[in-house]
């Protein structure tokens, strides 16, 4: 099994070691395994989980919502380990609620960005027209 130090995990995930320690402190990451020296080490599964957290964070999801989203662990693993879906319903419903709310926020941001992009393109067109007229008038 391949093990990663915190610096290697940070490098592999592009998440700073400071942020990894912070995520551990607030309970977003489970406490890592430690060597006899007390140094943290992470497995490939830990790395994949860090990347998942990063992807949620990159969409603008708050740490509070991410923490709520992941607190019950991996639902797919639980389904694969024969946990009854009825037992998972509360977790699934909570995740649906979080994702729905987050999707609504992202849709609003998308519309705002589309407006900014449109305005920026309009400005560029104006500036290109000015330069074109300047060249044609010489």
Swiss-Prot record:
Keywords assigned by UniProt, alphabetized: DNA-binding, Transcription, Transcription regulation
GO biological process terms, semicolon-separated: regulation of DNA-templated transcription
**Does the entry feature the keyword DNA-binding, yes or no?**
yes
Taxonomic superkingdom: Bacteria
Q: What is this protein called?
A: Uncharacterized HTH-type transcriptional regulator YyaN
Every HTH merR-type domain range: 3-72
The UniProt record lists the keyword Membrane: no
Q: Which organism is it from?
A: Bacillus subtilis (strain 168)
- In this entry, the residue ranges of the DNA-binding region are 6-25
GO molecular-function terms, A-Z: DNA binding; DNA-binding transcription factor activity
Q: Which residues form a coiled coil?
A: none
Under Pfam families, the record lists: MerR_1
Q: Which PANTHER family match?
A: REDOX-CYCLING DRUG-SENSING TRANSCRIPTIONAL ACTIVATOR SOXR (PTHR30204), TRANSCRIPTIONAL REGULATOR, MERR FAMILY (PTHR30204:SF83)
């Amino acid at each position: 099994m391949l093990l990663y130090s915190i610096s290697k995990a940070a490098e592999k995930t592009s998440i700073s070691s400071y942020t990894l320690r912070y995520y551990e402190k607030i309970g977003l990451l489970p406490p890592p395994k430690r060597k006899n020296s007390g140094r943290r080490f992470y497995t490939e599964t830990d790395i994949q989980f860090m990347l998942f957290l990063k992807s949620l964070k990159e969409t603008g999801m708050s740490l509070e919502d991410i923490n709520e989203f992941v607190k019950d662990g991996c639902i797919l693993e639980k389904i694969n380990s024969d946990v009854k879906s009825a037992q998972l319903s509360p977790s699934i419903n909570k995740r649906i609620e979080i994702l729905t709310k987050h999707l609504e926020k992202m849709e609003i941001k998308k519309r705002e960005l589309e407006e900014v992009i449109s305005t920026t393109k309009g400005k560029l067109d104006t500036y290109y027209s000015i330069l074109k007229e300047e060249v044609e008038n010489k």
